[in-house]
Amino acid sequence: MGFDINWGSALYQLLAFSVLLFFLSKFALKPLLGIMEKREQMINEQISSAEKNRKDSEAFIAEQRQALEQARMEANEIIQNAKKLSEQQGQDIVKAARNDAERIKESAVAEIQREKEQAVSALREQVAGLSVLIATKVIEKELNEAEQEKLVQEYLKEVGEEL
């Protein structure tokens, strides 16, 4: 059984394979490699874009957290200012109420004092009138001391009943 190689056929197959390889590399392999390079470049760009988007997202999240913290601080400050303002207003209201009460008290005391002075003045006028009346009657009657004392006591008793 011999294993004979047909050298003409082998050479022909080698030549055909070389020509096929040449044409494949010239017309099929270069465009295929170009497509693969473009695909690799596109994938690299997408990876870069995704990485950039991730970094931008992290920066945005950090900014949002900072803005949220700032908003919380401002809200707390507003609440504290509102508390202080309400306390101040409460104190102002109490102070105004005390001032009004003091003013009303002083007005009432002044009114009482005026009425007291009017009562004393009226009493003086009555006493003066009674004194004149007593003096007139004393002169008219020309009483002795005991009768005069009795008459004064009667008039004082009358004055006490009128008051």
Curated annotation (Swiss-Prot):
It is a single-pass membrane protein. One of its GO terms (molecular function) is proton-transporting ATP synthase activity, rotational mechanism. It is found in: Cell membrane. Pfam families: ATP-synt_B. The keyword Metal-binding does not apply. Keywords: ATP synthesis, Cell membrane, CF(0), Hydrogen ion transport, Ion transport, Membrane, Transmembrane, Transmembrane helix, Transport. The chain crosses the membrane at residues 10-29. GO terms for cellular component: plasma membrane; proton-transporting ATP synthase complex. InterPro entries: ATP_synth_B-like_membr_sf (IPR028987), ATP_synth_b/b'su_bac/chlpt (IPR002146), ATP_synth_F0_bsu_bac (IPR005864), ATP_synthase_B_chain (IPR050059). F(1)F(0) ATP synthase produces ATP from ADP in the presence of a proton or sodium gradient. F-type ATPases consist of two structural domains, F(1) containing the extramembraneous catalytic core and F(0) containing the membrane proton channel, linked together by a central stalk and a peripheral stalk. During catalysis, ATP synthesis in the catalytic domain of F(1) is coupled via a rotary mechanism of the central stalk subunits to proton translocation. Component of the F(0) channel, it forms part of the peripheral stalk, linking F(1) to F(0). Belongs to the ATPase B chain family. F-type ATPases have 2 components, F(1) - the catalytic core - and F(0) - the membrane proton channel. F(1) has five subunits: alpha(3), beta(3), gamma(1), delta(1), epsilon(1). F(0) has three main subunits: a(1), b(2) and c(10-14). The alpha and beta chains form an alternating ring which encloses part of the gamma chain. F(1) is attached to F(0) by a central stalk formed by the gamma and epsilon chains, while a peripheral stalk is formed by the delta and b chains. PANTHER family: ATP SYNTHASE SUBUNIT B, ATP SYNTHASE SUBUNIT B', CHLOROPLASTIC. NCBIfam families: ATP_synt_b. This is ATP synthase subunit b. The lineage of its organism: Bacteria, Bacillati, Bacillota, Bacilli, Bacillales.
